[in-house]
């Protein structure tokens, strides 16, 4: 019943149409562009991790070259020390040093202020991505998830859960 609501129906049907059109032929970035075109989205938001700024630049260039307006915002926006958000020193990578915090709520608010129509999440940390989704007014899709060990391919740990990662993943 919820799929028939005005706010969900076109979005869901368009998603199914894009899946069908590009099935096993289009990479996810192409799917995002085709979905956005089909939904008549012109202004896209890109919330990205500082560790993936090169990849974010490529994504932004590809989107712009395909006719989209892109508003991008890096995770460290605001340049606030983690301690300002209550992170204990022992939880910093280098205790006692300035360490800029990720700021997913500010990322969402900045994109909200620019009235983006659809937002793309590129490599935000676990939990930070959730806060970004929660505070984004526009719906969000994920292009890249962060996995510092597996070159941002977390499915690798799933494929090898019974072999290479068996001891690491046992509960």
Residues covered by each model-derived region:
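Electropositive, gly/pro-rich neighborhoods at or near active sites that engage anionic ligands
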Residues: 1-43, 50-54
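Gly/Ser/Thr-rich loops at beta-strand to alpha-helix junctions
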Residues: 22-26, 48-56, 78-79, 119-130
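Conserved acidic residues
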Residues: 42, 117-118
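Long, charge-dense
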Residues: 55-107
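Short Gly/Thr/Asp-enriched flexible loops that form oxyanion-binding sites at enzyme active sites
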Residues: 55-62, 129-138
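Short, acidic/small-residue loops that bind anionic groups at enzyme active sites
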Residues: 69-76, 131, 135-153
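A short, acidic, amphipathic alpha-helical segment used as a generic capping/interface helix at domain edges
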Residues: 101-116, 124-128
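C-terminal functional extensions of proteins
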Residues: 141-171
